[in-house]
């Protein structure tokens, strides 16, 4: 028991002892209290503040046994001796039929009423004390809110276990600010400067509105078997659309998470490869150059990793050829122990990661890894400062008039669906927003906090995208879908970013795997841990898929936009709009304008998906 709690209880005891008139009354107070004035206590409950075995007293002759509470008639009152004034009656006892005020006063003197009132307060106080902030026991399929919190330790929360608006806002911001941040300059280049910024802000508004529908939907349910305070969006879909709605929500939520695992694996392989290359090169005697600097296209410490002819040949075909060449040894085939043979970006490094990280995926509880959630906030801050420092170093390099200039900027581009698809996943928080807001100290501020969170995310995306785009000193077509690839491995700031992000992603990946298995296994088996064998099999399959993408299709931007457009169609556009229409129709508040507007949201999602394969 914490010291402050012991001191508080002792002070309460001293206060109540002062109000107990004599030893006899003190013994009476030690017996079991009535449940009429207490909070849901049976006849078998005992006061936890008293001794386990209170002394038993024999009842007075002809009186009511102490410790037993039964109604007495008016005819029996006169037969009770005078010492019966010390016997206990139910709290808030007002007498039965035929009792006059004089009889009631004879049963309860002023001292007795005061004493029993104090004991009732004591009993209620200790039954209402919160044992640590966990007011409700959540079912297994509901994710713990601290999974997304930026507070690394429970001690940083208040005594109620709740979090304020500032922590809630930054938890929303931290959850959305993911890997798509690295692809934002590339996505902006695909859409053009002006059109891209318009799409960024428009998608933020649409995704915020559908997320708002998600957080309001449990409140409008009337027949939900799960408590609305604990309901997930899949429960809402099940209530309105049956099992099909629940399975759609779960399946596409899992698809988003699997897409996140794949992108994480591609990026971790990239970061580990370049970090290892720098370490190896620095250990060589008389090393003055770093291999990636042989490109010789450095301008303002930025280089073009691929030629601008990337649209002339199928990109997947070129990458497949490169991956096979790397696994066969490439030009270093004559040297069987060459570092370049055993350290390849699309061959060996993703496999090394699989062996190194597989044990971390099989923990039953990921609580330990939630302590590192704050690293996400630090990494985002570092990237913001990193990009801003490059703007100061390189300056603004934009030319709106000369198409032949290397600084020429397109205001609009036909490849804008790459940006809209990426943003659908970038602004995706719909499967976690209810969990995050469940710990909110002031639920009435949920809409405000969600809107502020989306504004912060939109600002960061626009800032990263525009700043890097404006400062890029060569052709914009050279911008990589991971903008750290535009910096040599010898660049100190970019190398630090790679190493820091690698560690941060290693701590987040087990959380993603936990979310995948929790939602998937609960939908199939009704429990989040159906056995170690099933968990291991699922993790092996997921890692195999991730390694395959990292080897044969390591395109972060393309993976983001395809996963975002497919899963976003269902979870961001269709399901929230259909839930709103269904609930408004049941409440009688659905107007034709509202109906067509929400159907329009679904149409936007369909068009976004089709455009990924057309343009």
Curated annotation (Swiss-Prot):
<feature type="topological domain" description="Cytoplasmic">
    <location>
        <begin position="1"/>
        <end position="165"/>
    </location>
</feature>
<feature type="topological domain" description="Lumenal">
    <location>
        <begin position="555"/>
        <end position="561"/>
    </location>
</feature>
<dbReference type="GO" id="GO:0015179">
    <property type="term" value="F:L-amino acid transmembrane transporter activity"/>
</dbReference>
<feature type="transmembrane region" description="Helical; Name=1">
    <location>
        <begin position="166"/>
        <end position="186"/>
    </location>
</feature>
<feature type="transmembrane region" description="Helical; Name=8">
    <location>
        <begin position="492"/>
        <end position="512"/>
    </location>
</feature>
<keyword id="KW-0813">Transport</keyword>
<dbReference type="GO" id="GO:0046872">
    <property type="term" value="F:metal ion binding"/>
</dbReference>
<dbReference type="GO" id="GO:0005765">
    <property type="term" value="C:lysosomal membrane"/>
</dbReference>
<feature type="glycosylation site" description="N-linked (GlcNAc...) asparagine">
    <location>
        <position position="295"/>
    </location>
</feature>
<feature type="topological domain" description="Lumenal">
    <location>
        <begin position="274"/>
        <end position="341"/>
    </location>
</feature>
<feature type="topological domain" description="Cytoplasmic">
    <location>
        <begin position="359"/>
        <end position="367"/>
    </location>
</feature>
<feature type="transmembrane region" description="Helical; Name=5">
    <location>
        <begin position="368"/>
        <end position="392"/>
    </location>
</feature>
<keyword id="KW-0479">Metal-binding</keyword>
<keyword id="KW-0472">Membrane</keyword>
<feature type="transmembrane region" description="Helical; Name=9">
    <location>
        <begin position="534"/>
        <end position="554"/>
    </location>
</feature>
<feature type="transmembrane region" description="Helical; Name=2">
    <location>
        <begin position="193"/>
        <end position="213"/>
    </location>
</feature>
<dbReference type="GO" id="GO:0031902">
    <property type="term" value="C:late endosome membrane"/>
</dbReference>
<feature type="region of interest" description="Important for arginine binding and amino acid transport">
    <location>
        <begin position="175"/>
        <end position="180"/>
    </location>
</feature>
<keyword id="KW-0967">Endosome</keyword>
<feature type="region of interest" description="Disordered">
    <location>
        <begin position="41"/>
        <end position="65"/>
    </location>
</feature>
<feature type="transmembrane region" description="Helical; Name=7">
    <location>
        <begin position="452"/>
        <end position="472"/>
    </location>
</feature>
<protein>
    <recommendedName>
        <fullName>Sodium-coupled neutral amino acid transporter 9 homolog</fullName>
    </recommendedName>
</protein>
<feature type="transmembrane region" description="Helical; Name=6">
    <location>
        <begin position="414"/>
        <end position="434"/>
    </location>
</feature>
<keyword id="KW-0029">Amino-acid transport</keyword>
<feature type="topological domain" description="Cytoplasmic">
    <location>
        <begin position="435"/>
        <end position="451"/>
    </location>
</feature>
<keyword id="KW-1133">Transmembrane helix</keyword>
<feature type="topological domain" description="Cytoplasmic">
    <location>
        <begin position="513"/>
        <end position="533"/>
    </location>
</feature>
<feature type="topological domain" description="Lumenal">
    <location>
        <begin position="187"/>
        <end position="192"/>
    </location>
</feature>
<feature type="compositionally biased region" description="Acidic residues">
    <location>
        <begin position="42"/>
        <end position="52"/>
    </location>
</feature>
<feature type="topological domain" description="Lumenal">
    <location>
        <begin position="473"/>
        <end position="491"/>
    </location>
</feature>
<feature type="transmembrane region" description="Helical; Name=3">
    <location>
        <begin position="247"/>
        <end position="273"/>
    </location>
</feature>
<keyword id="KW-0325">Glycoprotein</keyword>
<dbReference type="Pfam" id="PF01490">
    <property type="entry name" value="Aa_trans"/>
</dbReference>
<keyword id="KW-0458">Lysosome</keyword>
<dbReference type="InterPro" id="IPR013057">
    <property type="entry name" value="AA_transpt_TM"/>
</dbReference>
<comment type="similarity">
    <text>Belongs to the amino acid/polyamine transporter 2 family. SLC38A9 subfamily.</text>
</comment>
<feature type="transmembrane region" description="Helical; Name=4">
    <location>
        <begin position="342"/>
        <end position="358"/>
    </location>
</feature>
<feature type="glycosylation site" description="N-linked (GlcNAc...) asparagine">
    <location>
        <position position="286"/>
    </location>
</feature>
<dbReference type="GO" id="GO:0003333">
    <property type="term" value="P:amino acid transmembrane transport"/>
</dbReference>
<feature type="transmembrane region" description="Helical; Name=10">
    <location>
        <begin position="562"/>
        <end position="582"/>
    </location>
</feature>
<comment type="function">
    <text>Lysosomal amino acid transporter involved in the activation of mTORC1 in response to amino acid levels. Probably acts as an amino acid sensor of the Rag GTPases and Ragulator complexes, 2 complexes involved in amino acid sensing and activation of mTORC1, a signaling complex promoting cell growth in response to growth factors, energy levels, and amino acids.</text>
</comment>
<keyword id="KW-0915">Sodium</keyword>
């Amino acid at each position: 028991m914490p010291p402050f709690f012991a001191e508080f209880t002792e002070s309460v005891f001293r206060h109540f002892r002062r109000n107990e008139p004599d030893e006899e009354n003190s013994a009476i107070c030690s017996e079991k209290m009535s449940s009429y004035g207490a909070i849901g206590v049976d006849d078998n409950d005992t006061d936890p503040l008293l001794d386990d075995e209170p002394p038993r007293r024999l009842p007075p002759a002809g009186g009511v046994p102490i410790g037993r509470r039964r109604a007495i008639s008016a005819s029996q009152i006169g037969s009770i001796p005078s010492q019966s004034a010390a016997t206990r009656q139910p709290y808030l006892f007002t007498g039965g039929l035929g009792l006059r005020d004089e009889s009631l006063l004879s049963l309860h003197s002023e001292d007795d009423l005061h004493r029993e009132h104090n004991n009732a307060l004591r009993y209620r106080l200790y039954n209402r004390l919160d044992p640590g902030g966990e007011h409700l026991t959540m079912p297994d399929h509901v994710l713990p809110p601290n999974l997304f919190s930026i507070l690394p330790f429970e001690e940083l929360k208040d005594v109620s276990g709740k979090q304020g608006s500032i922590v809630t806002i930054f938890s929303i911001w931290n959850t959305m600010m993911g890997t798509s941040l690295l692809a934002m300059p590339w996505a902006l280049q695909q859409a053009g400067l002006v059109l891209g910024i318009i799409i960024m802000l428009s998608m933020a508004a649409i995704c915020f509105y559908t997320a708002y529908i998600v957080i309001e939907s449990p409140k409008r349910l009337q027949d939900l078997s799960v408590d609305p305070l604990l309901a997930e969006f899949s429960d809402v879909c099940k209530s309105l659309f049956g099992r099909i709605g629940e399975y759609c929500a779960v399946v596409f939520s899992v698809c988003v998470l699997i897409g996140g695992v794949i992108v994480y694996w591609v990026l971790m392989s990239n970061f580990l490869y370049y970090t290892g290359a720098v370490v190896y090169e620095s250990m060589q005697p008389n090393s003055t150059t770093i291999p990636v600097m042989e490109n010789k296209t450095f301008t303002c410490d930025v280089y073009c990793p691929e030629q601008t002819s990337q649209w002339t040949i199928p990109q997947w075909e070129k990458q497949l050829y490169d991956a096979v060449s790397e696994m066969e040894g490439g030009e270093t085939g004559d040297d069987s122990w060459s570092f370049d043979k055993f350290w390849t970006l699309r061959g060996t490094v993703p496999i090394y990661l699989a062996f190194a990280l597989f044990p971390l995926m099989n923990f039953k509880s990921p609580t330990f890894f939630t302590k590192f959630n704050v690293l996400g906030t630090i990494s985002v801050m570092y990237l913001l400062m990193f990009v801003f420092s490059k703007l100061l170093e390189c300056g603004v390099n934009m030319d709106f008039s000369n198409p032949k200039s290397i600084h020429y900027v397109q205001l609009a581009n036909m490849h804008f669906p790459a940006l809209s698809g990426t943003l659908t996943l970038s602004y995706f928080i719909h499967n976690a927003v209810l969990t995050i807001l469940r710990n909110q100290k002031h639920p009435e501020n949920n809409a405000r906090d969600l809107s502020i969170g989306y504004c912060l995310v939109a600002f960061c995306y626009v800032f990263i995208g525009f700043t890097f785009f404006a400062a890029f000193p060569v052709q914009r077509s050279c911008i990589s879908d991971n903008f750290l690839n535009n910096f040599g491995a010898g660049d100190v700031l970019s190398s630090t970013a790679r190493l820091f992000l690698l560690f941060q992603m290693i701590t987040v990946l087990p959380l993603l795997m936990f979310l995948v298995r929790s939602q998937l296994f609960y939908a199939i088996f009704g429990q989040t841990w159906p056995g170690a064998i099933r968990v291991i099999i699922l993790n092996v399959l997921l890692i195999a898929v991730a390694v395959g993408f990292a080897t044969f299709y390591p395109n972060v931007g393309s993976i983001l936009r395809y996963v975002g457009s497919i899963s976003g169609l269902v979870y961001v556009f269709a399901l929230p709009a259909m839930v709103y229409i269904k609930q408004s129709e049941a409440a009688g508040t659905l107007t034709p304008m509202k109906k067509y507007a929400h159907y329009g949201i679904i149409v936007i999602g369909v068009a976004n998906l089709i455009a990924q394969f057309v343009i």
